[in-house]
Amino acid sequence: MTESAFEQKWSHKAQAKGWLSIKNIQMSLNGWPDRMYLKDRMVFFAEFKSKKGKLSELQKYRINQIRSLNFHVLIIYEQ
């Protein structure tokens, strides 16, 4: 399964549970996580990776930057 297909599958499941899924496609910040999820005043970010995928140094930096602002960032690997 491609990383994109895995991301879509996961997002459909989240949407079925009431989460609003926002795909970050036109961001001016490179390395920003793939999606943002919102529900009942809760927010988290998700970066999706294929089985062999790994985070770039810039992605690690952005994730740490977001976490330093007390937001949750999940890194979700395909099983």
Model region roles, listed by residue range:
Residues 1-79:
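Catalytic phosphate/metal-binding cores of nucleic-acid and nucleotide-processing enzymes, i.e., regions
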